[in-house]
């Protein structure tokens, strides 16, 4: 028999000789591997009797981490040794002459993976290559980017193609673990676009020279174990920013990608890249552990969804992305700590954007942008702590939005935006910890939703958003601590919204929402403990509101809201620490002309009620020039500790300075504030009955009782503090409020018409998405 075939059979016989010791001829255990190394390679091992030597070699070879070495893993050892010996002998035989190809081998060897060259070696291992799991027949430029002219270098450019772990962009045929076009994922979180990868030294079996260009993570054999290579340096060379987690690359943690590489803490992106450990993305990719996606992707554990996604545990979505800490999206890519995106890019602390970008931590928005921890979105994406959204983006503390962006402390907004912590939104989103959503997405524990989303600690909403401490709103703006908004949603911990969906524990709903503990709503949202209501919402302790929302610490609402301790309002908003309202925000600044109906006499202005939750004395802001009507007749609230009429309100925003002046003026004329439980004087019983009839749950009854008690308390205090002018003003204001309510009802009917038009617009957008999806499928077919 030929010498080469005898050598091949000898390699196989040695494996079976030691593998059959425990009865399993297919695997080598640790003890059997030790015997094989001592007997066969003892002369060249640096420390043959050192237990760490066996442990190190076992860890390098054991790719499936089962504690045993199978035949193809055993072949890796043989290949490594053959390559090292060949390299040494070749250098000696040629003296000082070294071809460029050999220098490429040296560079690859410095990267802890000796190069494999020469037709002789391919012939020698032709049969082993057939048996090798991680090797495969060579393609002529098949796995190379734009094709490499050199036969042996083509797979070394930007990553090696291998049989198991390479994901190919533009669909390369692969045997195991190939993911789809524009959406690849890999066994151990490796996403590749325009790029191939291998796990340790797979291409060596197929006779491919791994040049210095490849950094797919080779195990450092020489210089670490075998004495004949102790002079070699463990230098990792990376091309186009290949990700390498540590100096040793074990490919499961360091993926190479073409035009798409990232490092653990440096995100490089071309058309958007992201990944904590080096996951690459092509035109829309993945998240923390390498989930890739096209027009909607996945996240940490690869949960996929269509048109509406979720995040923390790896929900991917089509036309909608999210992930736990690195949401990628089409035309928008993030990465774990550096969010990038196409048509809007950003990174962790230097976010750049195209078509509108904003703020400190890089919230971009237009065709979707991510945020601090890399949330990007196309047609709306969220993530666990930073949700971005299309036509309106946001991030953790910097809400951005399309047609109106904002940043952390400089909030801009289209059609009027505001807020201390930067809530901006137009058709848009915002929240403190990243509430995104437009046609949007789910939340932390993977609640997915269709056309409307929420997230774990970030509320998303369609046509108006809010968040815990920074609520944004459309055609209506909130105040310092996040009063939202129009058509808009709010809640502290996971309220989802219009055309939208679930929350922290995965409550989903269509055209209706829920919050963290599963509150669902229709055209109206609840708050922390999940009070749901139809055309009427309530908050933590059962406050209902009509067309409005509330939340635990920032009750906002459209068409009437309530706040934490059960103050309900119709056509108005409030929140715990800063009540805002749509079509007129409640604040002392009503005297500034926000309320068209309080623009009359000075006496009426003085009698206008200050809306505040009383919890911490924070007054709600109102954006000047907002349209709408104010129906809150909230009286002054004071906590038990606030018994002095000349109480001092600490300004929290410069924008409230004028409000405090007005408040002081009102308080001087009204020395006594009502004692009580933070009851806000509410609108007339007629308004309450209207709100009550539209509540969908029984909490409305208890809430009504509380409100009646609030009226009694207020009346009692009014009699106790019989101040003639003050009582007269109160009664006059009460009548004015009844008139306001009638006008508000008319406005409500107009808003219903707007909603119908919005639904029609929504259906048109759905049709556009279907066309986009069809176009995308056509592109996929064309690329195939």
Curated annotation (Swiss-Prot):
Region (S-100-like): 1-91
Tissues in which the UniProt entry reports expression: Expression is scattered in the normal epidermis but strong in the acrosyringium, the inner hair root sheath and in the filiform papilli of the tongue.
SUPFAM superfamilies recorded: EF-hand
Residues binding Ca(2+) 2, per UniProt: 62, 64, 66, 68, 73
Single GO MF descriptor: transition metal ion binding
Residue ranges constituting the EF-hand domain according to the UniProt record: 13-48, 49-84
GO annotations of cellular component type: cornified envelope; cytosol; extracellular region
Annotated Polar residues bias: 286-296, 304-343, 356-392, 400-486, 504-584, 610-646, 680-695
PROSITE patterns: EF_HAND_1 (PS00018), EF_HAND_2 (PS50222), S100_CABP (PS00303)
Post-translational modification: Potential substrate of transglutaminase. Some arginines are probably converted to citrullines by peptidylarginine deimidase.
Comp. bias intervals (Basic and acidic residues): 124-201, 704-722, 729-784
Alphabetical keyword list: Calcium, Extracellular matrix, Metal-binding, Repeat, Secreted
Pfam families: S_100
Localization per record: Secreted, Extracellular space, Extracellular matrix
Region annotation (Disordered) ranges: 92-221, 282-584, 601-661, 677-784
List of residues binding Ca(2+) 1: 32
Family listed: Belongs to the S100-fused protein family.
Described purpose of this protein according to its UniProt entry: Involved in the cornified cell envelope formation. Multifunctional epidermal matrix protein. Reversibly binds calcium.
Domain-level remarks: Can be divided into a N-terminal domain with significant homology to S100-like calcium-binding proteins, a central domain containing a series of short tandem repeats, and two flanking segments with low homology to the consensus sequences of the central repeats.
Name the record gives this protein: Repetin
Organism from which the protein derives: Homo sapiens (Human)
Gene this protein is translated from: RPTN
């Amino acid at each position: 028999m030929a010498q080469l075939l005898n050598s091949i059979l000898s390699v196989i016989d040695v494996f079976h000789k030691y593998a059959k010791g425990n009865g399993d001829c297919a695997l080598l255990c640790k003890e059997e591997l030790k015997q094989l190394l001592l007997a066969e390679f003892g002369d060249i091992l640096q420390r043959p009797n050192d237990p760490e030597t066996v442990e190190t070699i076992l860890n390098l070879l054991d790719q499936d981490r089962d504690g045993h070495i199978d035949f193809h893993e055993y072949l890796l050892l043989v290949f490594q040794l053959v390559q090292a010996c060949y390299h040494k002998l070749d250098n000696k035989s040629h003296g000082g002459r070294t071809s460029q190809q050999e220098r490429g081998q040296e560079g690859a060897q410095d990267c802890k993976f000796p190069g494999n060259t020469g037709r002789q070696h391919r012939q020698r291992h032709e049969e082993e290559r057939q048996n090798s799991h991680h090797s495969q027949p060579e393609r002529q430029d098949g796995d190379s980017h734009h094709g490499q002219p050199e036969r042996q270098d083509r797979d070394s450019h930007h990553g090696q193609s291998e049989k198991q772990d390479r994901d190919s962009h533009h669909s390369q045929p692969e045997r195991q673990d190939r993911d789809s076009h524009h959406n690849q994922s890999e066994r151990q979180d490796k996403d590749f676009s325009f790029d191939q990868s291998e796990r340790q030294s797979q291409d060596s079996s197929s006779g491919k020279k791994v040049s210095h260009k490849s950094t797919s993570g080779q195990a450092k054999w020489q210089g670490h174990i075998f004495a004949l290579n102790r002079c070699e340096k463990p230098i990792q060379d990376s091309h186009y920013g290949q990700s390498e987690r540590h100096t040793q690359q074990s490919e499961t943690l360091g993926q190479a990608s073409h035009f798409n590489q990232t490092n653990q803490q440096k995100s490089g992106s071309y058309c958007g890249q992201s990944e904590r450990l080096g996951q690459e993305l092509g035109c829309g990719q993945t998240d923390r552990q390498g989930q890739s996606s096209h027009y909607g992707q996945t996240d940490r554990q690869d949960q996929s969804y269509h048109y509406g996604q979720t995040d923390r545990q790896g929900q991917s979505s089509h036309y909608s992305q999210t992930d736990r800490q690195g949401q990628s999206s089409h035309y928008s890519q993030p990465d774990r700590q550096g969010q990038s995106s196409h048509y809007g890019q950003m990174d962790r602390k230097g976010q750049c954007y195209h078509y509108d970008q904003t703020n400190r931590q890089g919230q971009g928005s237009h065709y979707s942008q991510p945020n601090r921890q890399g949330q990007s979105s196309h047609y709306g994406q969220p993530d666990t702590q930073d949700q971005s959204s299309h036509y309106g983006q946001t991030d953790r503390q910097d809400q951005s939005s399309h047609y109106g962006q904002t940043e952390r402390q400089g909030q801009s907004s289209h059609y009027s935006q505001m807020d201390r912590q930067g809530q901006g939104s137009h058709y848009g989103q915002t929240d403190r910890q990243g509430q995104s959503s437009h046609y949007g997405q789910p939340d932390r524990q993977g609640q997915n939703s269709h056309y409307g989303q929420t997230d774990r600690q970030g509320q998303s909403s369609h046509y108006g958003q809010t968040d815990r401490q920074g609520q944004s709103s459309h055609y209506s703006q909130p105040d310092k601590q996040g009063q939202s908004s129009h058509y808009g949603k709010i809640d502290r911990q996971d309220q989802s919204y219009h055309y939208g969906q679930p929350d922290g524990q995965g409550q989903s709903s269509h055209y209706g929402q829920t919050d963290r503990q599963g509150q669902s709503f229709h055209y109206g949202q609840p708050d922390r403990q999940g009070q749901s209501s139809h055309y009427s919402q309530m908050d933590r302790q059962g406050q209902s509101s009509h067309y409005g929302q509330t939340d635990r610490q920032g009750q906002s609402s459209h068409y009437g809201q309530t706040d934490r301790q059960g103050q309900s309002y119709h056509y108005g908003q409030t929140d715990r620490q800063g009540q805002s309202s749509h079509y007129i925000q409640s604040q002392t600044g009503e005297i500034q002309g926000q309320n068209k109906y309080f623009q009359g006499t000075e006496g009426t202005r003085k009698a206008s009620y200050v809306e505040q939750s009383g919890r911490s004395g924070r007054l709600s802001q109102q954006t000047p020039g907002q349209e709408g009507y104010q129906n809150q007749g909230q009286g002054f609230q004071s906590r038990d500790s606030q018994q002095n009429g000349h109480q001092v309100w600490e300004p929290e925003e410069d924008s409230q300075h004028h409000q405090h002046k007005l408040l002081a003026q009102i308080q001087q004329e009204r020395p006594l504030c009502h004692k009580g439980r933070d009851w806000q004087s509410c609108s007339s019983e007629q308004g309450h009955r209207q709100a009550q009839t539209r509540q969908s749950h029984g909490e409305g009854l208890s809430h009504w009782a509380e409100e009646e008690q609030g009226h009694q308390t207020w009346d009692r205090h009014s009699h106790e503090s019989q101040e003639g002018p003050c009582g007269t003003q109160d009664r006059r204001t009460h009548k004015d409020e009844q008139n306001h309510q009638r006008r508000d009802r008319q406005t409500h009917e107009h808003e219903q018409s707007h909603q119908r038009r919005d639904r029609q617009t929504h259906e048109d957008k759905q049709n556009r998405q279907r066309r986009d999806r069809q176009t995308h499928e056509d592109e996929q077919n064309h690329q195939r």
